[in-house]
Amino acid sequence: MDNDSQYSGYSYKSGHSRSSRKHRDRRERHRSKSREGSRGDKSVTIQAPGEPLLDNESTRGEDRDDNWGETTTVVTGTSEHSISHDDITRITKDMEDSAKLDCSRHLGVVIGGALALLSFLTPIAFMLLPQILWREDLEQCGTACEGLFISVAFKLLILLLGSWALFFRRPKAFFPRVFVFRALLMVLVFLLVVSYWLFYGVRILESRDKNYQGIVQYAVSLVDALLFVHYLAVVLLELRQLQPQFTIKVVRSTDGASRFYNIGHLSIQRVAVWILENYYHDFPVYNPALLNLPKSILSKKMSGFKVYSLGEENTTNNSTGQSRAVIAAAARRRDNSHNEYYYEEAEHERRVRKRKARLVVAVEEAFTHIKRLQDEDQKNPREIMDPREAAQAIFASMARAMQKYLRTTKQQPYHTMESILHHLEFCITHDMTPKAFLERYLGPGPTIQYHKDRWLAKQWTLVSEEPVTNGLKDGVVFVLKRQDFSLVVSTKKIPFFKLSEEFVDPKSHKFVMRLQSETSV
């Protein structure tokens, strides 16, 4: 496997003679041969296909020339990655955690499904058991009794559809704690069904009641009770949270991006899931490359002083006073870092405007060329291209401008060539304008717009001083953490407003003109 690795080459600059260069080449070849035996012990990272050619660190550099795409040497190969012992341990731990989460999630679904099936089949069992056990002793079921069968059938159908719509939905997240209201409803349904079964066993099964119409009415009463429980579930799980009661502020810890939301009565863990749902389409994508100051500012270091006392002991006080004076004078010196930052920002904005103008012109020309090809294709059917071929045909004319603009705005890690081609094909297919194509690249879009590998976190951690099953209260603060940043959430209760009414008589709107000697009428 190691022998299959290919290196693009190295460039050497030297002022020595040709013989010394040949000697150095032979020495390098000898060293490379001696390292072949131990090459398997070193980790070599090979860029996977489809990934951007620049990592996060390289995209931050501003000291590269504009022709980096033509002069950069890239090592290509298969998508092989090195894995250390720590990586294997971490992967094993993640697999164990995910297995625990899946088991607990499926356990709740199984319990809920079993309870729902028991509740649905219980009324049917109430009506079938007398027909099976003591059919000969039962009284005849009249017209009213037969009408109850229709009532039970439709009520069970409504209950089945309502339960499926409310409870059997795909879960949006895994909660760290039990959903209190849902668990309360499950306990209530369980107690209700068990109570009905106990009464049915004592008063009907043991005595073998002959009044079949009364048995059917008993089953109808259970179905009615289940319908009322379903109505209670709709109120507690859906309607209770619709009335806004709190205003929450969500701040991203790294760049300070913030949003405000109004929300109703929910537990902390459900609020956390609701915030994550809104985060992915409200917050711009997190780009760590935009957080750094220019290198010219970061490279500046504060001057340091070290004062030595070379005199006698009685001169200690004098040397201490002199050192303090020197340090104070250095501290009073004016720091010009803010000026450098200002000019760096101005230069960056100028470059962005310049690259943006070139990109807009290149895209406009490319789309105009596509329109001209479409008009010609109507006359020459043999030259018709599909959207993919058309996108590949015009991409070369805008690739350089797109590359420079994405690098200047530090968006290149989020847009691969394949994703740009796919978006261009989409725009051509639906007859979208150049502005519609550029909308994705001229500014940072919402997080969910990008590929999942760039924004989707496998797991968020909820950090809260309050129990996560508690409801929101005024002043509650909790944090949603992931590997590279966190969301800090603070809560404020919506104030109570008191309105007073003041009646104004329409007849009271009367005015008098005040005439003065200078007034012109």
Curated annotation (Swiss-Prot):
Organs and tissues of expression: During gastrulation, broadly expressed throughout the marginal zone and animal cap region. From the neurula stages, expression becomes concentrated in neural tissues, in the neural plate and neural tube.
The residues forming the signal peptide are none
Q: Which stretches are tagged as biased composition: Basic residues? A: 15-33
User: In which residue ranges is the amino acid composition biased (Low complexity)?
Assistant: 69-81
Task: Enumerate the Gene Ontology biological process terms.
Answer: convergent extension involved in gastrulation; establishment of planar polarity; gastrulation with mouth forming second; JNK cascade; negative regulation of canonical Wnt signaling pathway; neural tube closure; non-canonical Wnt signaling pathway; positive regulation of Wnt signaling pathway, calcium modulating pathway
What cellular component GO annotations does this protein have? membrane; plasma membrane; plasma membrane protein complex
UniProt feature, compositional bias: Basic and acidic residues: 57-67
| Membrane topology, Cytoplasmic segments | 1-108, 169-178, 240-521
User: Source organism's superkingdom?
Assistant: Eukaryota
Keywords (A to Z) from UniProt: Cell membrane, Developmental protein, Gastrulation, Membrane, Transmembrane, Transmembrane helix, Wnt signaling pathway
Q: Where are the transmembrane segments?
A: 109-129, 148-168, 179-199, 219-239
Keyword Iron carried by entry: no
Do the record's keywords include Endoplasmic reticulum? no
Motif range for PDZ-binding?
518-521
Intervals, Extracellular compartment: 130-147, 200-218
Question: Where, subcellularly, is it found?
Answer: Cell membrane
Which family is annotated?
Answer: Belongs to the Vang family.
Instruction: Kindly state the subunit structure of this protein.
Output: Interacts with dvl/dsh. Interacts with prickle3.
What name does the UniProt record give this protein? Vang-like protein 2-A
Native source organism of the sequence = Xenopus laevis (African clawed frog)
